[in-house]
Amino acid sequence: MSHLAELVASAKAAISQASDVAALDNVRVEYLGKKGHLTLQMTTLRELPPEERPAAGAVINEAKEQVQQALNARKAELESAALNARLAAETIDVSLPGRRIENGGLHPVTRTIDRIESFFGELGFTVATGPEIEDDYHNFDALNIPGHHPARADHDTFWFDATRLLRTQTSGVQIRTMKAQQPPIRIIAPGRVYRNDYDQTHTPMFHQMEGLIVDTNISFTNLKGTLHDFLRNFFEEDLQIRFRPSYFPFTEPSAEVDVMGKNGKWLEVLGCGMVHPNVLRNVGIDPEVYSGFAFGMGMERLTMLRYGVTDLRSFFENDLRFLKQFK
């Protein structure tokens, strides 16, 4: 009891010297803890006469209260200083411009479709569209594709029933257009098509674009000239191009078109040919008066060749690291 004032003074000095909340808590334990200096003063009350104990206890409690108030005040100071330091470190410079929201970009396949539509639009072609759920007449029969052709098999085509299917080509758009209007006809038909195939260079759904001209005096020379100009415009270089004889039921003669790659090898890019007379007859156009040419190409294939992509499936995986390269 005799040195109570000294203990309070010592505690206040230690409190004022505490540099953080942890050090301050150590001071609290030293003086007010279960075995703290001031707490132990209560044990001296038993040495006093009973009538003096209440007054002495009140003095000890007052001393403890002074120390507790000093602890609370110092804790508030330390917490305020810590907050101010954190705010100073996190100060926002309001004069800095905000972070710009990153702009999106067109998918590389969409860029290819737009580029091709722009080129053929300048040649007078219009864009035609048609249903993706097609019937076997427009997808096969009208295109001179016989019933035994392997393209009709389940392993190549997605059938709903005996006559309804997911279109395997956009050629059905050509049939619908020729039935709806008389020549001259000059269209391109971009769109999604579906085939039962999946590997590094094939997916069950992909994009195709077909072109069609029907008019008088249309020749294979017109076809070659149009595709020569298109390929050199699309790849933006003076490519070596060759036409190889091929077979398609809906064109005669038919050809496949190759370009010379940077590795010195020929790369197939599209198929084409003169519209088969049977196809013209199927839509009520006289093949003795009119002729035409058609061509078809895969958009993913051309996009892969233009940008050097090796796996077609990358176009459908929505990986932003891949897609951002084409912005």
Swiss-Prot record:
<keyword id="KW-0436">Ligase</keyword>
<comment type="similarity">
    <text>Belongs to the class-II aminoacyl-tRNA synthetase family. Phe-tRNA synthetase alpha subunit type 1 subfamily.</text>
</comment>
<dbReference type="GO" id="GO:0004826">
    <property type="term" value="F:phenylalanine-tRNA ligase activity"/>
</dbReference>
<dbReference type="InterPro" id="IPR004188">
    <property type="entry name" value="Phe-tRNA_ligase_II_N"/>
</dbReference>
<dbReference type="GO" id="GO:0005524">
    <property type="term" value="F:ATP binding"/>
</dbReference>
<keyword id="KW-0963">Cytoplasm</keyword>
<dbReference type="InterPro" id="IPR010978">
    <property type="entry name" value="tRNA-bd_arm"/>
</dbReference>
<comment type="subunit">
    <text>Tetramer of two alpha and two beta subunits.</text>
</comment>
<protein>
    <recommendedName>
        <fullName>Phenylalanine--tRNA ligase alpha subunit</fullName>
        <ecNumber>6.1.1.20</ecNumber>
    </recommendedName>
</protein>
<keyword id="KW-0067">ATP-binding</keyword>
<keyword id="KW-0479">Metal-binding</keyword>
<keyword id="KW-0648">Protein biosynthesis</keyword>
<dbReference type="Pfam" id="PF02912">
    <property type="entry name" value="Phe_tRNA-synt_N"/>
</dbReference>
<dbReference type="GO" id="GO:0006432">
    <property type="term" value="P:phenylalanyl-tRNA aminoacylation"/>
</dbReference>
<keyword id="KW-0460">Magnesium</keyword>
<dbReference type="GO" id="GO:0000287">
    <property type="term" value="F:magnesium ion binding"/>
</dbReference>
<dbReference type="InterPro" id="IPR004529">
    <property type="entry name" value="Phe-tRNA-synth_IIc_asu"/>
</dbReference>
<keyword id="KW-0030">Aminoacyl-tRNA synthetase</keyword>
<dbReference type="InterPro" id="IPR002319">
    <property type="entry name" value="Phenylalanyl-tRNA_Synthase"/>
</dbReference>
<dbReference type="InterPro" id="IPR006195">
    <property type="entry name" value="aa-tRNA-synth_II"/>
</dbReference>
<dbReference type="Pfam" id="PF01409">
    <property type="entry name" value="tRNA-synt_2d"/>
</dbReference>
<dbReference type="InterPro" id="IPR022911">
    <property type="entry name" value="Phe_tRNA_ligase_alpha1_bac"/>
</dbReference>
<keyword id="KW-0547">Nucleotide-binding</keyword>
<dbReference type="InterPro" id="IPR045864">
    <property type="entry name" value="aa-tRNA-synth_II/BPL/LPL"/>
</dbReference>
<dbReference type="GO" id="GO:0000049">
    <property type="term" value="F:tRNA binding"/>
</dbReference>
<feature type="binding site">
    <location>
        <position position="252"/>
    </location>
    <ligand>
        <name>Mg(2+)</name>
    </ligand>
</feature>
<dbReference type="GO" id="GO:0005737">
    <property type="term" value="C:cytoplasm"/>
</dbReference>
